[in-house]
Amino acid sequence: MDLHNKLSGCFIGKNIGGTLGMPYEGIETYNDLTWYRPVPDGAIPNDDLDLQLVWIEAFKTHGVALDSQRLSKYWMKYIDCHMDEYGIALRNMNKGVMPPLSGKHDNFFTESMGAAIRAEIWASLFPGKPLTAGYYAWQDSMVDHCGEGIYAEMFIAILESDLYASGNLRESLDFAIVFLPDDSRLKTAFNDIINLYESSISATEARDLIMKKYGSVNFTDTVMNLSFIVMALLYGENDFSKTILLAVNCGQDTDCTGATAGAIMGILLGKEAIPDQWKEKVGDDFVVGDGIGCTTPKSVSELIDAIEKIHDKMPDELPEITLPFRLPELTDFAERVPWVVNGRRIEFPGGIKIDSMLYPEVLGKNPLLKTIVSFNKTGTINLTISTIGIFVCNWDKNFIGSKGDQMQPIPAPHRVRGGRIWPVTVKAGQKYELEILMYSTWPIPEVYVIFSDLHTHRHIIPQYHI
């Protein structure tokens, strides 16, 4: 099979799987899809593809010298996407915290799916060169992830790059698993799934066992979702339709699992072998989201043309990761954000997270947290408070709301879970008191406090006056 057919299959498969899964993103239960539902009139915007289209523009400019520092500049100049780890990485970089710390510092979502979904561009730029694809996936993912979040993108890039050359899905899957360190949770999960598959239990049973052992309250958790992808690849038995439906029907981060499974199957089978019923509903065009601020390829054909032109000029000497590979140790730093807790001034080490277990003797049974903030803008912004705890919140000495459940927190302004979000109106330079009264629970919970743009969810960095 020619490389052009595989490259086209990769990104058409990515588009199909993302379009199939998008309407079910975040659904935690098992789905029962057999085809698109609803049936689309074309492709839809998806960050699974959007950021990769920016990366191809970055590679056109920087070539093999592209690294995390150069990618961070493209983030800050051209990407206005603030979901989960994207928003935290941009917040960090706007404060001068650059890679690799931008992916670790104050980041609840270090091991989410945001990097793993960007792997196709590196595999496709370096087909049959998995250690080079893995190198660029590492440079990419460290901007907004650490730990398993980095290994996840490297794993997918290595698998896909090797698959371009091998044409054997199981062979490339095994090769990519070997790359992972022995203490990686991803590696443990993948080996568990292979054992489940080889024991002949059903795909539905395998999905339930994955959830039991690796399930997360965060529907974008990368160990959980990559486990679904690997399960779908094994149980799909080289059938495009069966594989993407298995991935999406597992639930959780369905646009990402469907898109990645579709890309892998597209590489394996090529564009021509993808059933027409899937292709004709999304077509060749990309629909790029509003958060992308530069000119990008407008279709699969245009993207593949750009990739093939880069192939023609690729130098012989390319960077590679060395095996065995292990991420370097990374030490975070403390921001020292001031609060008054039960009458005592405390500087917490995070800009978002108040780690109350650092001071259990001060917080007592009913912690009262106060701070005073100001902003460099005028208008209405969002205040997000996320915690497993029960609390009452006052803003500028006025009650604005409370939380009466003990749901696990997901501190993201666009999808807050285990918390509340309120619009508050501010004037530039004016000071506002924020007061959070926590009710008695044990252990004393962490509290996440985020200010963000009302519409884009861009993190807004306050000034503190305690």
Residue ranges and their predicted role:
Residues 1-365, 385, 390-400, 436-466:
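Structured, active/binding-site neighborhoods that engage oxygen-rich ligands
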Residues 374-382, 429-431:
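Extended extracellular/luminal ectodomain segments enriched in beta-structured repeat modules
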